[in-house]
Amino acid sequence: MALHDTPSARKVTTTPDGPARLYVCGITPYDATHLGHASTYVAFDLLNRAWRNAGHDVTYVQNVTDVDDPLLERAAKVHVDWVELAERETELFRQDMAALRVIPPDHYVGAVESIPLVIELIGRLETAGAIYRVEDDLYFSVTADPAFGAESGWDRERMLEIYPERGGDPDRPGKKDPLDCVVWRGRREGEPSWESPWGPGRPGWHVECTAIAQRHLGGAFDVQGGGSDLVFPHHEMCAGHAQVAVPGTPFAQVYSHGGMVGYDGEKMSKSRGNLVFVSALRNSDVDPMAIRLALLRHHFRSDWEWTDDQLWVAVDDIARWRKALSLGAGAPAAPVIDEVLAALADDLDAPRATAAIDRWVAATLGTAGLADTTDPDAAARLLAALDAALGLALWLS
């Protein structure tokens, strides 16, 4: 399995030693799952499946940021309890992922339940001299990590430009370095808080993922995944925390990042409101397999724009594939399956994999000539391969 590694900017081969270990950053559950989310989780589901199909056991961990500023702000705005909102949207997310046939993580871990882990990690960082206080908040000093910047490959100027757009506070008085990040936010009026050795408060965003990953996966796990908007500051900060807490051990071996999905000319995001929700499509009786196929038509690392036409093309494609699969016999399946597996092993190239299926369907239906039905078991073999490798369940009732 070769994946493009963000820090090295090249494809590297993942070589799991024992169970493959995967961490993908999860949602902040204050709204429904949109197609940008779905694209990321479908992509890393391909990795999970590829490892499993290659015979590896897989330990897959995903967090849910079930306490954070956006969640608290949304709960206040719509006049619901923040816990109720988080639980409702988390359950909807799980339903959406199940409909898209994303294999659930082995450990799906909330920030709130992980607060003891976060406190323990902050204590280790404090012992290492990497923590300081600004009023009631605790900050991580990025200079404590000699390798800071290696994960993103960004220079300081670019970091400072982007940091305030992604939750950072570079201009706060009292900070030692503008890029330092909060690891413990002291109690604010009207906000939930938990006791700690440094006073009541709640975790910072980055440190929760570090604590969860270290507890459930250990150090130097195989792949850290997420969207490209997490390269900096999130994954850079997570790596910094981990590498100061456990010197000499990298946080992850490979960092793999998916592209951004746009809609109406801009990145799909909750703040802009230009969202297409998986649940809304499902409630409109759209076949979830068509949604998944529409996502798979794009390479996961590419930025791309969603259009409704793509969905309807996928609906038609699924119908055409099912028609070919209903025949039983078809064009030889073995070379098609080999091509699908080879494509996915090459940086999760789902467009190449689905194109191989298109060619088999065309040959089987005789779209461009005589129908090829020389393989009597083609449909059964391809149905199983589509399910196992691409997560497309096209079994005929």
From Swiss-Prot:
It catalyses: 1D-myo-inositol 2-amino-2-deoxy-alpha-D-glucopyranoside + L-cysteine + ATP = 1D-myo-inositol 2-(L-cysteinylamino)-2-deoxy-alpha-D-glucopyranoside + AMP + diphosphate + H(+). GO terms for cellular component: cytosol. Binds 1 zinc ion per subunit. Zn(2+) binds at residues 25, 209, 234. SUPFAM superfamilies: Nucleotidylyl transferase (SSF52374). A motif ('KMSKS' region) lies at residues 267-271. A motif ('HIGH' region) lies at residues 27-37. L-cysteinyl-5'-AMP binds at residues 25-28, 40, 63-65, 205, 227-229, 261. Its cofactor is Zn(2+). InterPro entries: Cys-tRNA/MSH_ligase (IPR024909), Mycothiol_ligase_MshC (IPR017812), Rossmann-like_a/b/a_fold (IPR014729), tRNA-synt_1_cat_dom (IPR032678). Keywords: ATP-binding, Ligase, Metal-binding, Nucleotide-binding, Zinc. A motif ('ERGGDP' region) lies at residues 165-170. Its EC number is 6.3.1.13. The keyword Isomerase does not apply. Gene3D superfamilies: Anticodon-binding domain of a subclass of class I aminoacyl-tRNA synthetases, HUPs. NCBIfam families: mycothiol_MshC. Monomer. Catalyzes the ATP-dependent condensation of GlcN-Ins and L-cysteine to form L-Cys-GlcN-Ins. Belongs to the class-I aminoacyl-tRNA synthetase family. MshC subfamily. This is L-cysteine:1D-myo-inositol 2-amino-2-deoxy-alpha-D-glucopyranoside ligase. The gene is mshC.
